[in-house]
């Protein structure tokens, strides 16, 4: 049995990292799906074409929702590689690599090298991080930047090196450029709570923090300029917010600094509300932190218990970054699962610390071991279920990894003992289900994207112009070779008989067929990959859940 000082060797670390990297690389080429991701990709493509970097528009309309960094990076990537899934997702994946390395360095800084290794592997192999590299939103970049900022700033506190201070506040500025004030609040709460609990008054009142604040302001200044000129200087401008509410009179700066984040917590923002419960993020954590959810819970409560009993021996950076943001987000009137991912790296550090400290003869270790045996059985069962009941396949390419993995798991249970067995078997069990998820389940699910199918079909024709009046068909925009013009169905009389097509959903097809003498009609089945209910997953009932989209030559 390996002792706790050498739980994971360098060779094992890189082998595990390489294994899970296959899932990330596969995700780079998976279809862009989901409402947010398709909006962001479409907006980024428009930004690339218009070269309007500071004032943000979507389909020619003013856009006031997310800050611009994600769009800047995606637009830049589109310029280099063309508009594609790979180009859209690549910047986010690179920031995930930065987040993984930063988690390692921060875990090493706060504890030791082994905790750093364990924490970074837990982070990189977690469902949440893999998922947000498939369904790419602003949070993917945010997570990597925030943990990078914390690593740099905590290093600065310990070494007083200016470079770390500068990099830390550049990171905070970039985090604010990608998701707003939350990019500032998590680092501030992390350091602030630690300083207050440890009574490190000299660290609170460092004059160098003022320099750092100026650096962050400088980083976000292009965005502030754009918001001010696009909205605050034009208070009578008529536009709609992302929710569809009228935006006339909305201050861009106030929206950014208050409404978008704190307004949702206090209730002053009436734009977004989904009445989620105080416990919404409890079950969110349990599925998104997989396969390390129980380690995360045990690690958090052990850290709280030991910190209360002896605060002088413990750091409070991790608790500061987790507890207050978690409680504040739980009170928010609008909650989505990915909101809590911003402090997951710190939580993975606590989970890694807990594994390192865990005594293999303790009752808690025995409980953990049996829970993870059950988890591994569940992972394999789910994999088999997907391949037999949801999206049946006889492909040896899909089944071989499951059988090989089961043999490997038997070997690990037989030849390894203690915590190393728990870590390795769980990683292997989760790798099996993630292989099925990344290479079979998700590609099959997104293949039912009707707008994407229509875009692919349009490439078979000599298309002059493409039209649509369905604002939720943005994957059609992204993947079509011809720019899509949005017009009402009844506004196309001057565009008939010239190789033009209109893309509509089933509620609009009757109007098109009644108004125009169609030359060809192509029908596509559709189901949103972000709304996967059992009725869709079961092959026997799937046809009853499908919507229809149509591509019509007019």
Stretches found by the model and what they are:
Residues 1-365, 444, 528, 532-534, ...:
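Membrane-integral, polyisoprenol-dependent glycosyltransferases
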Residues 2, 166, 302-483, 487-554:
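Membrane-embedded architecture of ER/inner-membrane glycosylation machinery
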């Amino acid at each position: 049995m390996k002792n706790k000082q050498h739980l994971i060797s360098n060779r094992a670390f890189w082998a595990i990292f390489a294994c899970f990297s296959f899932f990330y690389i596969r995700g780079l080429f998976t279809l862009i799906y989901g409402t947010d991701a398709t909006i962001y990709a479409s907006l980024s493509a428009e930004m690339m074409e218009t070269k309007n970097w500071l004032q943000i528009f979507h389909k020619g309309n003013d856009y006031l929702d997310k800050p611009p960094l994600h769009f800047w990076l995606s637009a830049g990537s589109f310029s280099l590689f063309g508009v594609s899934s790979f180009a859209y997702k690549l910047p986010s994946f690179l920031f995930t690599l930065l987040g993984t390395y930063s988690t390692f360095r921060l875990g090493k800084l706060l504890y030791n090298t082994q905790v750093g290794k364990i924490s970074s592997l837990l982070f990189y192999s977690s469902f949440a991080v893999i998922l947000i590299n498939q369904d790419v939103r602003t949070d993917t970049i945010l997570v990597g930047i925030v943990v990078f900022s914390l690593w740099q700033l905590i290093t600065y506190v310990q070494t007083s090196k200016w470079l770390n201070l500068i990099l830390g506040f550049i990171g905070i500025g970039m985090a604010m450029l990608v998701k707003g004030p939350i990019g500032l609040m998590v680092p501030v709460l992390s350091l602030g709570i630690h300083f207050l609990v440890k009574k490190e008054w000299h660290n609170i009142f460092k004059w160098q923090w003022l320099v750092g604040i100026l650096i962050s302001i400088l980083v976000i200044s292009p965005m502030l300029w754009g918001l001010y000129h696009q909205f605050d200087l034009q208070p009578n401008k008529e536009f709609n917010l992302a929710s569809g509410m009228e935006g006339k009179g909305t201050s861009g700066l106030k929206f950014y600094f208050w409404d978008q984040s704190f307004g949702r917590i206090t209730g002053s923002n009436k734009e977004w509300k989904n009445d989620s419960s105080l416990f919404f993020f409890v079950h969110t954590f349990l599925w998104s932190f997989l396969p390390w959810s129980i380690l995360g819970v045990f690690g958090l409560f052990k850290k709280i218990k030991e910190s209360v009993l002896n605060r002088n021996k413990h750091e409070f950076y991790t608790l500061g970054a987790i507890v207050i943001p978690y409680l504040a987000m739980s009170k928010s009137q609008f909650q989505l699962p990915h909101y809590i991912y911003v402090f997951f790296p710190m939580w993975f550090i606590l989970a890694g610390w807990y594994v390192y400290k865990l005594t293999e003869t303790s009752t808690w270790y025995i409980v953990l071991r049996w829970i993870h045996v059950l988890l591994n059985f569940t992972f394999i069962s789910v994999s088999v279920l997907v391949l037999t009941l949801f999206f049946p396949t006889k492909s040896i390419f899909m089944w071989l990894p499951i059988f090989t993995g089961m043999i490997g798991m038997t070997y690990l249970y037989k030849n390894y003992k203690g915590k190393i067995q728990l870590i390795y078997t769980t990683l292997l069990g989760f790798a099996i289900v993630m292989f099925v998820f990344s290479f079979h389940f998700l590609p099959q699910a997104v293949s039912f994207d009707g707008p994407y199918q229509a875009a692919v079909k349009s490439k078979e024709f000599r298309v002059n112009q493409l039209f649509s009046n369905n604002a939720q068909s943005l994957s059609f925009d992204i993947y079509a070779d011809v720019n899509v013009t949005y017009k009402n169905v009844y506004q196309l009389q001057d565009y008939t008989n010239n190789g033009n097509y209109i893309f509509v959903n089933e509620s609009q097809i009757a109007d098109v067929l009644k108004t125009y003498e169609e030359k060809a009609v192509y029908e596509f089945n559709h189901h949103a990959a972000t709304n996967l209910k059992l009725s869709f997953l079961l092959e026997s009932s799937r046809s009853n859940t499908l919507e229809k989209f149509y591509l019509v030559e007019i």
